[in-house]
Amino acid sequence: MTQLRQKYGLLIIGIVIGIGYGLLTRFVFGESATLASITYLFIIPTILGVVPLMFADNDQLKSYKNIIFIPWLTVSTFFLTMFLVGLEEFICLLILAGPFFILGTIGAFIFQLIQINKQKSKGKFLTLLLIPFLLAPLEELIKSPSLIFKIDSEVIISATPEEIWNNIIEVKPIRKDEYYSGFFNRIGIPRPISATVDKKQLGGQRMGNFEGGLTFIEKITRYEPRKMVSFTIKVDPKSVRENVFDQHVLNGNYFTFVNASYELTDMSDGRVKLRLSSKYQLTSKINFYGKFWGDIILMDFQNRLLKVIETRSER
């Protein structure tokens, strides 16, 4: 036991320091930056993979198991700590996981290559810890671009346009046994509950209600009975939940719903093709990464909602 402590003692200290460094950056940069910052999503994970290895000896650095396992252990413990103290929710950590684990490992391999071949003083690598605090203010000076993305989902329904139309203009309360909750619902994405409309015409206001009290305020911008309906979407700020993910995304000026539309197309076999299209806007310097997750989550949501409409219309 004493030999193990002597052999891995410094490495364990390095892991603890790495976790502490990760928590420090999370507190300094705040929740608004975690999903929208180049520094937080790409630079910090790389450094986090290096920090514990600064306390490893050359024999430990030569072990590829250590180069992979130590950064992963550091990141995993860092994530677990943030989850337990309520800094992040599971869905946030899922989104962060790819860059943190991959870049942490890459950083560790780069450190191994430099340290073993060049025998650089490990003290010099400590300056790496300052890089995020120098880059983040510079990143803030660069205006974040805003891009709009579109998601399309379709379903073929054996029902009349009238029956389908009645199930999309207004949505009666959706029972739990009607909506098949998926992975994303279980980790924090609210499921739809109902939708009401004050006037079934152009300019009418539609209210989309979700689990947990979240409400979408929707204004009808196109209305063609039994053919097409479009509406803008705004999140009611009073309905945004206090959980970390909603505050990150819906109150962070990072993700914004733009509009949605339903389009019905008659098919030659008497069935109807129903298309649900949604547009959303991302404003960050890593819109490509936000789009990756935005598309996955919205596609899952739309497909599940269309399944409810299909089932109700075919009764």
Stretches with model-predicted labels:
Residues L4-G9, G22-I70, F100-G104, R186-N259, ...:
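Glycine-rich portal/gate segments that line the openings of hydrophobic small-molecule binding cavities
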Residues A97-G123, Y254, A260-S261, K273, ...:
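A conserved amphipathic terminal alpha-helix motif
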Residues I148-I156, Q205, T215, M228, ...:
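Intrinsic-disorder/low-complexity, polar/charged segments enriched in Ser/Thr/Lys/Arg/Asp/Glu/Gln
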Residues L94, D152, H248, W293:
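Conserved short-loop catalytic and cofactor-binding motifs
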Residues I157-E162, T221-M228, E263-L274, E310-R315:
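A short, structured loop/turn motif at beta-sheet edges
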Residues Y64-Q115:
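Membrane-embedded alpha-helical segments of integral membrane proteins
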Residues F27, E31, M54, N58-K62, ...:
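Membrane-interface elements of multi-pass transporters and channels
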